[in-house]
Amino acid sequence: METIFDYNQIKQIIPHRQPFLLIDKIVEYEEGKRCVGLKQVSGNEPFFQGHFPNYAVMPGVLITEALAQTGAVAMLNSEENKGKIALFAGIDKCRFKKQVVPGDTLMLEVEITKIKGPIGKGSAKATVDGQLACSCELTFAIQDA
């Protein structure tokens, strides 16, 4: 897969930083419409120290955060939104179907489905090797940083 935005370019679009930046690169992008990101899940992730020490599983809330960050890239790279911030405003119909563990490559897909003023919605899914790990509907609000 071709890299559209690498790790450093992502940091120019969204304000998240380590240890909370949860996407490594963007491989598909349609401004304001759709974005696909990848996260290489390493055993060295700080959250694995406590979740769980003897059974490492990526927390579901961090999978949904990674999806939200991917959606933020789709929205914040436009000229009208540069320098703004996308806030996580809600989540609906969230389901976890597969555990995400060290060594997995998490594919994060977000399609923006509705925008009304500064509020928007997106349909999101995270997969590992083509298997659904998480699906949800995200709500976000864009505001000045």
Curated annotation (Swiss-Prot):
Xref: Pfam families: FabA
GO annotation (BP), single: fatty acid biosynthetic process
Entry keyword Ligase: no
Source domain of life: Bacteria
Gene3D superfamilies given in the database record: Hotdog Thioesterase
UniProtKB keywords: Cytoplasm, Lipid A biosynthesis, Lipid biosynthesis, Lipid metabolism, Lyase
Reaction it catalyzes: a (3R)-hydroxyacyl-[ACP] = a (2E)-enoyl-[ACP] + H2O
Family that this chain belongs to: Belongs to the thioester dehydratase family. FabZ subfamily.
Function: Involved in unsaturated fatty acids biosynthesis. Catalyzes the dehydration of short chain beta-hydroxyacyl-ACPs and long chain saturated and unsaturated beta-hydroxyacyl-ACPs.
Entry-linked PANTHER family: 3-HYDROXYACYL-[ACYL-CARRIER-PROTEIN] DEHYDRATASE
Protein name per UniProt: 3-hydroxyacyl-[acyl-carrier-protein] dehydratase FabZ
UniProt source species: Staphylococcus epidermidis (strain ATCC 35984 / DSM 28319 / BCRC 17069 / CCUG 31568 / BM 3577 / RP62A)
